[in-house]
Amino acid sequence: MRLFSIPPPTLLAGFLAVLIGYASSAAIIWQAAIVAGATTAQISGWMTALGLAMGVSTLALTLWYRVPVLTAWSTPGAALLVTGLQGLTLNEAIGVFIVTNALIVLCGITGLFARLMRIIPHSLAAAMLAGILLRFGLQAFASLDGQFTLCGSMLLVWLATRAVAPRYAVIAAMIIGIVIVMAQGDVVTNDVVFNPVLPTYITPDFSFAHSLSVALPLFLVTMASQNAPGIAAMKAAGYSAPVSPLIVFTGLLALVFSPFGVYSVGIAAITAAICQSPEAHPDKDQRWLAAAVAGIFYLLAGLFGSAITGMMAALPVSWIQMLAGLALLSTIGGSLYQALHNERERDAAVVAFLVTASGLTLVGIGSAFWGLIAGGVCYVVLNLIAHRNRY
């Protein structure tokens, strides 16, 4: 793989996947680390370890299977830790991470997760993905309210470029956005410090009570709200890779990195959609290059973990929101088409889409899981009724 021979839109897709992933949830991980009692240096080490783990796993799986397999930390898992780690010591938090990732490895080895994913109808997987991505599309247009000049210009340039050179539309929008942000003086780089920080080994402290109260919920949230949508997104995009090896590999890697602050590494859904879209590459079989580029950017982000928070603060939120929405627009449209074009499965797909898009959280598990469950129940019930009426 030669970077100089990779088309610019493919390079941009890989970069955007990492940028949006960090921009959307790095602050949540920072909060969780603070709650656990980590120092600033230890938090920087956590970000370094997470970046390296995601970079290694993304590159290894993508290059091995030649499909765009993007990994990511679990954002719902990080949100759970913000409350779940309260009252725990840092050593106990590391023990929770190790137990969680050991459970993920066990789940992958038994093949239970793979068997469950095989029975999910394609329309429901697409509906769930559309529901996950909907908020990014809505945020993009909502950002016009506060930053009309910036976001309106990005939208107009994207639309004009889309008409004549579709593959370069997102690049053009990004460039005009940067120009306007620089002209307005909205980039603040005072807090960006590019000093590589090595991860610090933290001795784990295991507790049966914490394993039940924190590790088990974190395991369930990671599998239901991260790995399940990630595998379903791959399926919806038309890619197939053996599920169990993906889960085992990411779980083992996270297990190795757990003492350094890696609480999970799962299969990405939202950011992976950028690398799996036609904008990344017109040839479906070449889109793995975008994921490989993302893996390289993950490694770079890991090497400069101390700069991540400062970099996120330097960019206007509206610029990131508009860019994310434009990058995911075709994926949202394609997912909706795949979800709704089969009339017999349409009602179940609509239920899955709406429940997922609602942001519903029950027992600490996010709406993506419940969207699949609700859509699946509708699918089974409606098919049983149709079968009974037929005979």
Map each language-model feature to its residues.
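Short polybasic/polar patches that bind polyanions
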Residues: 34, 118, 235, 258, ...
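Helix-loop-helix hairpins and the membrane-proximal interhelical loops
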Residues: 1-44, 171-244, 391
